[in-house]
């Protein structure tokens, strides 16, 4: 789970609302986003570096190695960031590896409410990572 500064509260609220479902999964999050999620939900989250310190790239590496089945990335389309190239690279790798990606609450709600979200046999990213 990743969120830009202006979207962190939205992602934390989404995680709180979906705590029961998320607790069944291995969760990864970048820096402050992950810390906030842990503080507000008590979910077990593997904390990576902050996005601008390489956390986005760490998530990308996890995707490339078949460790991420879904990407929840609430990004701010109205704010330009110094690490925009990292954001673009993360979104590119998610598409390349066929990882369902949510960039806002509505899409995240659709992904988590899909019967495929908890289906262990549905792993399109892992199939792509084997190539």
Cite the ranges covered by each PLM segment.
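Short internal beta-strands
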Residues: 24-33
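Short, acidic/small-residue loops that bind anionic groups at enzyme active sites
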Residues: 28, 91-111
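Mid-chain, well-packed structural core segment of small domains
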Residues: 55-94
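Short, hinge-like loop/turn segments at secondary-structure boundaries
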Residues: 44-47, 64-66, 89-90, 118-122
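N-terminal phosphate-binding or glycine-rich loops at protein starts, especially the Walker A/P-loop
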Residues: 2-23
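Short, glycine-/small-residue-rich phosphate/pyrophosphate-handling segment
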Residues: 105-131
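Short hydrophobic/aromatic-enriched beta-strand-loop microsegments
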Residues: 26, 43-53, 123-124
């Amino acid at each position: 789970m990743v969120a830009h500064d202006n979207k962190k509260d939205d992602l934390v609220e989404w995680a709180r609302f979906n705590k029961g479902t998320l607790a069944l999964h291995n969760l990864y999050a970048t820096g402050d986003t992950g810390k906030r999620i842990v503080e507000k939900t008590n979910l077990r989250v593997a904390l990576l570096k902050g996005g601008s310190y390489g956390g986005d790239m760490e998530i990308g590496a996890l995707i490339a190695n078949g460790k991420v089945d879904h990407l929840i990335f609430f990004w701010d389309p109205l704010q330009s960031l110094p690490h925009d190239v990292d954001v673009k690279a993360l979104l590119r790798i998610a598409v390349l590896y066929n990882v369902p990606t949510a960039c806002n609450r509505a899409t995240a709600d659709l992904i988590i409410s899909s019967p495929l979200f908890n289906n262990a046999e549905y792993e399109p990213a892992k199939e792509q990572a084997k190539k």
